[in-house]
Curated annotation (Swiss-Prot):
Subcellular location: Host cell membrane
Modification Cysteine methyl ester, positions: 212
Molecular function terms, GO-annotated: GTP binding; GTPase activity
Provenance organism: Acanthamoeba polyphaga mimivirus
Protein name, as recorded: Probable Rab-related GTPase
GO aspect biological process, one term: protein transport
Sorted UniProt keywords: GTP-binding, Host cell membrane, Host membrane, Lipoprotein, Membrane, Methylation, Nucleotide-binding, Prenylation, Protein transport, Transport
Length: 215
């Protein structure tokens, strides 16, 4: 394993990526989580934006989340794949008022699973629930069925409502807290999932440098 990645994992650095179509509110969700305030008129992400935050899981474990907010525009999709590398958690975001963005969720999940074999937890985020339900283009039953059929969880959220954003990241944080390096393994690059799986050992020794940083 790349020594940089190994060091990050040993220091409880967990890579979380946000994927989804353009305009669904990925950057606004990240901004709400980091700064606890809403933001409007966000410029489209180009490539990816990076931020990190130290958090505490329900089990008391302190984690460092490395959050990658990726571009959703179709012209950047080939670039976005680079940021899948070594992700352990994924938030797949869509806009409840945009049917096409929900239809695209299958593409994003399938693309992730084809190109990344380290992702432990996928959470589908139905965003913009602050908008009147008369304007929703996706029903909860559809979301529930889709996630059941595609083996992932879902949550409703609004980047304007901090409690919903904290809730979705709380779910991710608790899942990430189940992951740890096996100290007894002869291979230092093996990570096992407590009471869940035999482990993740297919890491790619490369991290893309084409990103911007959120301070």
């Amino acid at each position: 394993m790349n020594s940089y990645i190994k060091e990050k994992m040993e220091n409880n650095g967990y890579k979380i990526i946000l994927i989804g179509s353009s305009g669904v509110g990925k950057s606004s969700i990240v901004h709400q989580f980091l700064f606890n305030r809403k933001i409007s008129n966000v410029s489209p992400t180009i490539g990816a934006a990076f931020a990190s935050k130290q958090v505490i899981a329900k089990n008391g474990k302190t984690l460092k989340l490395n959050i990658w907010d990726t571009a959703g525009q179709e012209r950047f999709r080939s670039i976005t794949k680079m940021y899948y590398t070594n992700s352990l958690g994924c938030l797949v975001v869509f806009d409840v008022t945009d049917r096409e963005s929900f239809d695209d969720v299958y593409y994003w999940i399938n693309d992730l699973r084809i190109n990344c074999h380290t992702t432990y937890y996928i959470l589908v985020v139905a965003n913009k629930i602050d908008i009147d339900k008369n304007n929703w283009r996706v029903s909860e039953n559809e979301i529930k069925k889709f996630c059941r059929d595609n083996d992932c969880d879902y949550v409703f959220a609004s980047s304007f409502e901090s409690d919903t954003v904290n809730n979705l990241f709380g779910k991710m944080i608790d899942k990430m807290s189940e992951i740890k390096i096996n100290p007894d393994s002869r291979r230092n690059d093996i990570i096992y999932l407590s009471d869940k799986s035999s482990g993740i050992d297919d890491f790619i020794d490369k991290i893309s440098q084409n990103c911007c940083y959120i301070s």
